[in-house]
A protein has these predicted regions:
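Conserved beta-strand elements of the Class I
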Residues: 104-106
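Active-site-adjacent helical/loop segments in soluble small-molecule enzymes
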Residues: 48-102
Length: 133
C-alpha cells in the first residue's frame, strides 16, 4: 500500500506509513517495490515504526481502550491487528505535533474488520463493536 501511494504521488506529497509489523526491513521492501514499479525512487515518505505494539497480532489494553474510545467518538470501526494500530499512531503523532498545522491528513483504512468478531470471541468481547453492529 505504501509503495503504491508513494509511486502514485510521484514525490508530490508526504506519505507516512504505519506498519503493523515489527522491524525496519520494510524500508528496503518499499523502496524495492517503488523502484520496480516506477523505475525511480522517491524520498517523500516515512516509515513510522513506533506503533506495532510488539508486532503482527500483538496488542495491549492501551490499544483496546483507544479502539473503543475511537469508536465511541467517531463511530468508525477499527481492529486491533491493522487499522487500530494505524489510527493510534496517527492520533499520537498529531498529539505530539508531528504534522504541520492545518495539514490535510488522509488515512487509508486498509481492512481487517473481519477479525473483530473472531477477536471478541477469542478474548471475551474486549472491543465494544462487532462487524455487524
Amino acid at each position: 500500500t505504501a509503495a503504491g501511494l508513494v509511486g502514485g504521488l510521484a514525490g508530490m506529497s508526504l506519505v507516512k506509513a504505519f506498519p503493523a509489523l515489527k522491524g525496519n526491513f520494510l524500508i528496503d521492501e518499499i523502496n524495492s517495490f517503488i523502484w520496480e514499479s516506477m523505475g525511480e525512487s522517491y524520498d517523500n515518505w516515512q516509515l513510522i515504526t513506533d506503533y506495532h505494539f510488539g508486532g503482527y497480532t500483538k496488542w495491549n489494553q492501551e490499544l483496546i481502550d483507544f479502539i473503543n474510545e475511537f469508536y465511541q467518538k467517531f463511530r468508525l470501526k477499527i481492529d486491533p491487528i491493522y487499522t487500530g494500530k494505524l489510527f493510534y499512531g496517527v492520533w499520537n503523532e498529531i498529539k505530539k505535533g508531528n504534522f504541520k498545522d492545518n495539514s490535510t491528513i488522509v488515512v487509508i483504512h486498509t481492512g481487517g474488520l473481519q477479525g473483530i468478531l473472531g477477536f471478541n470471541q477469542r478474548f471475551g468481547n474486549l472491543l465494544n463493536h462487532n462487524v455487524e453492529t
